[in-house]
Amino acid sequence: MSGAKRKYIEAAYELLARDGLNSVSIRKVADEIGCSSAALYRHFPDINELIAVASIRFLRDYIEDARILSKVEMNPLELNLQLWECLAYYSFRNAEIFDNLFFGNSDGGRYSEAVRGYFEEYPEDLAGLKDFMLDMFRDATTVAERDSVLLNRAAENGMLSRDAAVFLCKLDTYLFRGMLSDLRGRDLEEDDFRWVTREFMDLLIRSYTTQLEEGYSILVVKPDFVAQNATRDADERSSYRVKIIPVKFGPATKGVSKATA
């Protein structure tokens, strides 16, 4: 039974990757694997649920990067910004699919059900994540809820006020949604996607610098997206390396941001 469901998910994923969101139907998925539509309906009540579950498969590289980041010692704000950069890097290339997945259902029901359905079939995709990150990926019902986990931890650590955590959660989500919406249907080159990811991160970092508690500043260590050459390799990824640092000398100033190449 489980093997059959995986076939349906993977066939829908292949159609999404090859032909786009509007190309997927129960009939096309059934034709792709040589089964009847009735067989699919035994596992998925409608095409929207199948598309949502299959869309989670596009997050595999993002989850792999999160697995790598979970092994690096970072505070909650550093980790949150790194995760946002990873999510932007992958989702902007499939803006239509991710806009539909994250925001196609305003109450978050589609995303949470898709996450649950996908990881029931592919629990191995979550292997190696730390406990709180595992919970964050598996249990968060919306993008905003995932964001709030780390922002609230930062507030508990005294890096943000509670009000700032709420403000940044809203801002992060609205900005991400706006970027996805703007990118839908646009035919861009790889350099263009890097540029919009860079723009997204610049806007986030500027916003975060205005909300840090006194005594903290943001240091952008390496604002690059690919290490040395243009070949993308998950194990060689070099993206924003953000450090939230204490300001040790002189009066602390909110909104101070430093960047070095």
Language-model features and meaning:
Residues 56-63:
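Short, basic, alpha-helical segments at the C-terminal edge of helix-turn-helix-like DNA-binding modules
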Residues 32, 86, 100-107, 171, ...:
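Short acidic/histidine-centered micro-motifs embedded in hydrophobic/aromatic stretches
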Residues 53, 68-104:
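Hydrophobic alpha-helical connector segments
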Residues 1-19, 23-32, 49-52, 73:
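Basic, helix-initiating cap at the start of DNA-binding domains
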Residues 33-44:
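Short hydrophobic/aromatic patch on the recognition helix
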Residues 15, 90, 94, 179:
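Short alpha-helical functional segments enriched in proximate histidine and acidic residues
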Residues 107-156, 202:
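Amphipathic alpha-helical packing segments from all-alpha helical-bundle domains
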Residues 141-161, 165-261:
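C-terminal peripheral helix-coil segments that are non-catalytic and often amphipathic
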